[in-house]
Regions:
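A conserved regulatory-domain signal marking ACT and ACT-like small-molecule sensing domains
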Residues: 301, 305-386
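Oxidoreductase and adenylate-handling cofactor-binding alpha/beta cores
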Residues: 88-107, 153-160, 285-299, 334-338, ...
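Phosphate-binding beta-alpha-beta segment of Rossmann-like dinucleotide-binding domains, i.e.
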Residues: 80-138, 302-303
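Rossmann-like adenosine-cofactor binding region
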Residues: 43-45, 167-260, 275
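An N-terminal-biased, well-structured beta-alpha scaffold segment characteristic
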Residues: 1-79, 192, 212-214, 218, ...
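N-terminal Rossmann-fold NAD(P) dinucleotide-binding loop
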Residues: 148-149
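Glycine-rich Rossmann-fold phosphate-binding loop(s) that bind the pyrophosphate
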Residues: 144-145
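Rossmann-like dinucleotide-binding domain for NAD(H)/NADP(H)
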Residues: 213, 221-313, 357, 368, ...
Length: 386
């Protein structure tokens, strides 16, 4: 039986995917085999020796020490796309709300309490909140992953002209994207075309300040920008300067900061993107399934620090080896399996940056002695026999 520790409140719908005959889910345990986490800060957490995996019920993993996990042979999973619909719906809602000045208009209405001539005041005051329909306008989508592709498709259905930029678009995302979305190979070519720009890329050193002085200079005057991905993707100083000059007429974001709160034309929401029970359920279910499949079968799906390896079992025992991505590893591993007289039914080896994963299905004397010999190979970090 595997022990699973939960560091946050995890949806019962997800926990139900962990069969109680194979998994013991507990909040208080010092030696878990797996951890389910949402937002708890694990950066300074000391990991027990038998910890095999951490599954994050969400996409971002900046609360998990990835490098240290890799060094200790701990597989880290996330749940890309599980909250995509929740975020996409909010983006479309804010796109419309921002275009029609809904937030500032609703706030103005709160001051009408007790006005004896409210109807006249409303008719007179509504002119200051004049907005625009989005039908026929142009939307630029930066990043066409699970969320960006949904936003693009929905905008097409609402009558917008949509351009998309994503040099790393996956095959699955491309298949799911409407044929009416126009693909741009260069971000600088897309920006001048757009009345609205929405960002849906992960936060990486290469994506920090995607919206900056240079990119803003290329945009249409009066462009509206939506950021429901990561706050750091937009350079705040450049944004505020562009709003003062009228280059940017509106900024809608899920990431409030002291610098932008209270500024005209800026609407902040308190990180509501994935805050729906449906999204929490979806994330928990995906995280639990990933964790279960790895612990029981050694399959790695949606890991952020290890290569993806997903194979049906071919019979016999399964040998799972996490090791450094170095030359000669396969020959060292197979030399030991040959010495042990094993017949390899199936073998997969994949790498991700400096990490690699080798998985073998074999028949014969797969025992503790073999595991110890495999673990003694200098570049091997962890060996499991399932």
């Amino acid at each position: 039986m595997y022990t699973i520790k939960t560091l946050n409140a995890i949806s019962p719908v997800g926990l139900a995917k962990l069969n109680n005959k194979q998994f013991d889910v507990a909040v208080d345990t010092d030696a878990p085999d797996g951890i389910l986490v949402r937002s708890a800060d694990m950066l300074n957490t000391a990991f027990n020796d038998n910890l095999l995996a951490i599954a994050r019920a969400g996409a971002g993993v900046n609360n998990i020490p990835l490098e240290r996990c890799s060094e200790q042979g701990i597989v880290v999973f996330n749940t890309p796309g599980a909250n995509a619909n929740a975020v996409a719906e909010l983006v479309i809602g804010m796109l419309i709300a921002g275009s029609r000045n809904v937030a500032v208009a609703a706030q103005w209405c709160q001051g009408l309490t007790g006005d004896p001539a409210m109807a006249k005041t409303v008719e007179k005051g509504k002119k200051q909140f004049l907005g625009y329909e989005i039908k026929g306008k142009t939307l630029g989508v930066i990043g066409l992953g699970a969320i960006g592709s949904r936003v693009a498709n929905c905008a097409i259905e609402l009558g917008m002209e949509v351009y998309g930029y994503d040099p790393y678009i996956s095959i699955d995302a491309a298949w799911n994207l409407s044929s009416q979305v126009r693909h741009c190979v260069n971000l600088n070519d897309m920006l001048p075309l757009c009345d609205y720009i929405t960002i849906h890329v992960p936060y990486l050193p290469t994506t920090k300040d995607t919206i900056n002085v240079q990119t803003l200079a290329l945009c249409k005057d009066g462009v509206k920008i939506l950021n429901y991905a990561r706050g750091e993707l937009v350079n705040t100083e450049a944004l505020l300067e562009a709003m003062e000059t009228g280059k940017v007429s509106g900024y809608m974001t899920d990431f409030p900061s002291e610098a932008i709160l209270g500024k005209p034309g800026i609407v902040c929401t308190p990180h509501l993107g994935a805050s729906t029970p449906e999204a929490e359920d979806n994330c928990a279910v995906m995280a639990a399934k990933e964790l279960s499949d790895y612990l029981k079968n050694g399959n790695i799906i949606h890991s952020v620090n290890m290569p993806e390896v997903n194979q049906p079992r071919a019979g016999g025992k399964r040998i799972c080896i996490i090791h450094k991505n170095e030359p000669g590893m396969i020959s060292q591993i197979t030399a030991l399996t040959t010495e042990a007289g094993l017949n390899i039914e199936n073998m997969v080896n994949k790498s991700k940056k400096n990490m690699a994963y080798t998985m073998l299905d074999a028949t014969g004397a797969v025992d503790k002695k073999l595991a110890e010999k495999l673990a003694a190979i200098p570049a091997v970090i962890r060996v499991r026999i399932l």
